[in-house]
């Protein structure tokens, strides 16, 4: 019979609540050089929190996608393979046996393994330190499983962070999650110069003396770039010096699946409309410094997303911080950030309305400058130093309220158990029928003639319960009920 011994418990680790001692914080998410928005966010957040208090010691647990092999910096102390369930358990052990006092998780359904990224729950459940979770996506109509995952995150974490008021409202209406554990901290942006030499930056990009329209971000079909291209003929007929830059590489997942089909379609659309010479693709992944220069060179930033279901946009926040005049479709985050004449909105997919907005701004330098001034003044509150301070304040209050917690499930699940490969119950299932576990087998074939005995079924029940605690599955739960 298979026997799962109860290993020794991990030693208890005292948790200091003093903020005079080092505060090791583990940041979990994708990380540079991986090319995705959350990777950039994790880099910036870790640096901002470390800068906010001299005793903060950041470390990173980087989530790696199946196709990725990255040369991470020394900040990364542990690598979690996205689809390896065992890696999440090992990562929790690493944290529990380290000096980490708090974990900050960057949550997006698609970056973690399991159904809708459910493996992250295994990681959080096994931790013995407080956890704060930042939600990068909050859906209006989540699937039952997506809603359940966020509800479990809420139950298991000390604080759930969202980046906008609309995200907080959606948590309440679509997930049933509300209360003081939900905190709003905006998306951070770099500190940028108030009055850059815009013409010098334009000269660097070969467009000195021209009006620069800009969109940036990883390219994919949901970005709505075709709406802007279709608006160009009406605009360039009156302002022939205008050029539209589309800055950013094609999203890696899209590139693997479709290649450059979307970019090719956009180029053909521009050719057909006779505006190809007014369109320039900068199809590479840009550094933070290059991005700053592009944004500060731009006169108008266009965010033409096709769907309202966008509770946060780092690109939109960055553009406002650079002092660009922002024109956007009315997705949720844009409605919130651009209220109070901090930008201009136009309907989804409506290139005619967009052309009117662009003509108004290009034809009125006073209005254009007023929009830029309002955006820049508002964005000051989202600068990374302020966001780092806000996160540190939350970390400090969390540590004071809950310096240590007990891992859920089996008390302090040991390293030996969770480091095992995924448990296979095939033989035990084969040895079990509607009555219980059969007493003997010939090699792997159940010997039904030998019947059943109470002590074997009692031991089988113990094994099934322990298996369900260590690596829960429908099979282990079925065996518990059977025995």
Segments the model singles out, each with a brief description of its role:
Residues 257-285, 289, 435:
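Nucleotide-activated donor-binding/catalytic signature segment of Leloir-type glycosyltransferases, i.e.
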Residues 158, 278-284, 293-310, 324:
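Acidic donor-binding loop of glycosyltransferase active sites
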Residues 27, 207-223, 229-232, 245-247:
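Conserved donor-binding/catalytic core segment of Leloir-type glycosyltransferases
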Residues 320-321, 325-328:
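Short hydrophobic beta-strand element within catalytic cores of glycosyltransferases
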Residues 408-459, 463, 470, 474-483:
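Low-complexity, Ser/Thr/Pro/Gly-enriched N-terminal "stalk/linker" regions
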Residues 340, 344-351, 360-365:
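Conserved acidic donor-binding segment of nucleotide-sugar-dependent glycosyltransferases
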Residues 194-207, 212:
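A short helix/loop element that forms part of the nucleotide-sugar donor recognition site in Leloir-type
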Residues 166, 188, 250:
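Carbohydrate-associated surface elements
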